[in-house]
Amino acid sequence: MKKNAKKGLRKGRGSRNTLKIEDIEAVFAERKPGAEGNFKFFSVLVPLVEKEDDLYLLYEVRAKNMERQPGEICFPGGELEPVETTEECALRETWEEIGIPQEQIRVITQLDTLYTYSNFAMYCYLGVIPEAALEHLQFSENEVDEVFLVAL
């Protein structure tokens, strides 16, 4: 025989409090969900280059002597400094790694943020680098072995 569900419902201990659903809704009304964890924060620039009416992505090959991820193909980027925004970080790292001044980079938009299993939060920015800037690239020898373009 089925039990009456309402009769079978018991109040938990301490259920005499006055907390209401409205109270909970008020607490969460302005809350923005975020990532849980102890993250290290990084930013990258996903650089587009318009060259001879074609569009390219610019990639780096990380220096083989790097402690982490040597020889990997990546975008310019690195760890966030405490005094900068994530966008400023992406632009600073592009300058440090391949010598393109931030004044020459036009940021189009922020892309999705990637949260990794190893507690990295990677902020990504899509930007445009003028073709003329490619003539003046200066690699950080400690970080970059080469750069190359891939047509889209």
Which residues are covered by each model-predicted region?
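Entry/capping segment at the start of metal-dependent catalytic domains
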Residues: 1-36
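A generic short-segment signal for beta-strand/edge and adjacent turn/coil regions
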Residues: 12-17, 26-30, 41-46, 75-78, ...
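Short N-terminal helix-initiation segments at or just after the protein's N-terminus
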Residues: 20, 63-72, 88-94
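Short secondary-structure boundary micro-motifs
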Residues: 29-33, 56-57, 62-63, 82, ...
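N-terminal strand-loop-strand
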Residues: 34-75
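Unchanged
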Residues: 79-152
